[in-house]
Structures are given as C-alpha cells and as structure tokens.
UniProtKB/Swiss-Prot annotation:
SMART domains: PCRF. The gene is prfA. Belongs to the prokaryotic/mitochondrial release factor family. The lineage of its organism: Bacteria, Pseudomonadati, Pseudomonadota, Gammaproteobacteria, Pseudomonadales. The modification N5-methylglutamine is found at Q237. It comes from the Bacteria. This is Peptide chain release factor 1. GO terms for cellular component: cytoplasm. It is found in: Cytoplasm. Pfam families: PCRF (PF03462), RF-1 (PF00472).
Length: 360
C-alpha cells in the first residue's frame, strides 16, 4: 500500500480516537445536533479503522514469520514459509479493501433518479428503440427491487416513444444508473424494411439524481410559468373532465417539465416541481464537472450526453460499450433487463480509475 495512503489512515485513526472522546463528552451529548453529526461521522470512520487495525496486526504477524525464516530449525522454517504466504495473501486482500473504503464517496449514489429517454436520429425506428430501452431499464429495475413511475410520455407513431420520462425509486439507484447517460446507438433491420437492410438509429439517455430536499434548489416562483391542460395519459374517463396535467416552464433556463400521469393536478404539480429541481441541480452539477474535467478527464463518467457510449447490434447479437471497449454477445439477455452485464464492468473500471488516482 502507498505510503501516502498509510498516512491518511494514521490521520483517520487519530480522528477516530477524537470522535470516541467527543461522543462520551457530556456537553456534546446534551447538544443533539452535534451528537448526531459526530455519530454519523463515527459510523463512517469505524469500519475503516477496524479494517486498518486488522491490517496492522497481519503486518506484524508477517514480520514475525519472516524473522523465523532465518531460524536454524528446518521444520520451523517450513512452518514460517507457510505463515508468510498466508499473511501476504491476507495483507493484500485487506489492503485492497482499505483502498476501496478510502475512495471518494459520491453523495448522489443513494438517491432516486429521473430517467429521460429521447429518440434521436432514425425517425420511427429511433422511437421504437426508445421504447425498447425503457423496457430494458424497467426490467432491470424489477430485478433490483426498484419502483418505476412514468411521469411523461410522448408515443411514437409506430410504437415506442419520441420521449419518455420516469422516476426510479429504490436503493442506490443513481449508483447503478449514473453511467447510462449518453447516446445509445442501435443497428438492426426495421420490421418495415423489405430489402433487409440494416438501419442505424440513436437515442439519448439522461439520468438525473433527485435532490434530497427540493428546498436545497432555490426556485423563485416568479421565474415559473405554470400551464394546466387535459391529460391524454392514464386515468380513464376522468381525463376528459378536468385540467389535471401540469406543464412548468422555468423562464431563466428555458427548462420545461410536465406531468400528466396522476389524476390530481396537485400531485402532478408536485412531481413536475421535483423533476424541475433535479434538472436545475443537474445543470449546476454539469457546470462544476466541466471545470473538473478540464483538469483531469475520467475514462468513465464524463456524463456528456452527446457522447456515443454504447452500440446495440441486433444482427450480431452484440452490445458494445465504447468507453471501456467492452463487447458482449448477449444482447438478448441485456435487452431483457440483464444490464448489470454492462453496468458492473463500468463500475469496476471507474473504481480502478479512482484507485489509480488515490494518494496522488
């Protein structure tokens, strides 16, 4: 392990001792705000320190076993060789675990997301593929135990969607889906193609973390134009009776959001406002990330939605993620929701990139 990382762990050990003392201090205990803050920090630091103590113990065991390698007794040397090999293996595993614990935490990882899928070049075929992608992500969400709620949809003339917006709720949704933003390209023979020619179409996907508290994003009511209209979505006969659908325009940014899936105008407005907050937050984050990217560009995770990130080739049964040069010949499984086949290698590559930078 790098000396710089060991130094960080030593500093963290000192902080752990300090937190232990603070949490036993009567003055801190009487101040619930400080007590909760220190308790949260303690809970985050403790697993790292316990692992670091194990690391130091195994390190001492290794040094002791190595000293015995010089012993005159051959049986003792053989035993020491076994202990050295075992200790080195445990030390390497603990070192890897500690490095991952020290990786910078993305504060958005635990959040729900707004998933936006839009048809790009390719006309009807692009809209159909948008529908396929939405189905793929919905199946993946089912596997993860997440809940998918459609907020807005604009259906294509021959199936699929020109645009579909959904909220995905569950554990660590953003952590899994954050690298799906970008341009997704499909190569296949459309059902309407009589000559059997392969067509290329594209869709864009955007994954926006839902802010924890809408209040964190300052939205001036004077900056909003709110329009209501009769829903053309779900709701049966009710949709013909009231203007329950809501469209909100944020005038300074030009961002427009709408929700028509609920029968209640109040619920549609609340969901549209949450989505607007996410889009404004995303706009702020994008500006900050651009500044970081100019200094150091990560292999995975630039989040540029104009970037072509993946190709789905149906004739070959192939899916290729261009960011990490990953090619799989299990397109059918992926389209049925096994997106983890692509997501997990992306996450591993991102972690490897972070690990390489750790301690710099």
């Amino acid at each position: 392990m790098k000396a710089s990382l060991l130094k960080k762990l030593d500093v963290l050990s000192d902080r752990y001792e300090e937190l232990t003392a603070l949490l036993g201090d009567a003055e801190v205990i009487s101040d619930q705000t400080r007590f909760r803050a220190y308790s949260r920090e303690y809970a985050e630091v403790e697993p790292v320190i316990l692992a670091f103590r194990d690391y130091r113990k195994v390190q001492a065991d290794l040094e002791g076993a190595q000293a015995l390698l010089k012993d005159s007794d051959p049986e003792l040397r053989d035993l020491a060789e076994e202990e050295v090999a075992e200790a080195r293996g445990r030390l390497a595993a603990l070192g890897d675990s500690l490095q991952r614990m020290l990786l910078p935490k993305d504060p958005n990882d635990s959040r729900n997301v707004f998933l936006e899928i839009r048809a790009g070049t390719g006309g009807d075929e692009a809209a159909i593929f948008s529908g396929d992608l939405f189905r793929m992500y919905s199946r993946y969400a089912e596997r993860q135990g997440w809940r998918v709620e459609t907020l807005s949809e604009n259906e294509g003339e021959h199936g699929g969607y020109k645009e579909v917006i959904a909220r995905v709720e569950g554990d660590n949704v953003y952590a899994k889906l954050k690298f799906e933003s970008g341009a997704h390209r499909v190569q296949r023979v459309p059902e309407t193609e009589s000559q059997g020619r392969i067509h290329t179409s594209a869709c864009t996907v955007a994954v926006l973390p839902e802010p924890d508290e809408q209040a964190a994003i300052e939205i001036n009511p004077a900056d909003l134009r709110v329009d209501t209209y009769r829903s053309s979505g779900a709701g049966g006969q009710h949709v013909n009776k009231t203007d329950s659908a809501v469209r909100i325009t944020h005038i300074p940014s030009g961002i427009v959001v709408e929700c028509q899936e609920e029968r209640s105008q109040h619920k549609n407005r609340a969901k549209a406002m949450a989505w607007l907050a996410a889009k404004l937050n995303d706009q702020q984050q994008a500006a900050a990330q651009q500044a970081i990217a100019s200094t150091r560009k990560l292999l995975v995770g630039s989040g540029d939605r104009s970037e072509r990130i993946r190709t789905y080739n149906f004739p070959q049964g192939r899916v290729t993620d261009h960011r990490i040069n990953l090619t799989l010949y299990s397109l059918g499984e992926v389209m049925e929701g096994a997106v983890e086949q692509v997501i997990e290698p992306l996450l591993q590559e991102y972690q490897a990139d972070q690990l390489a930078a750790l301690g710099d």
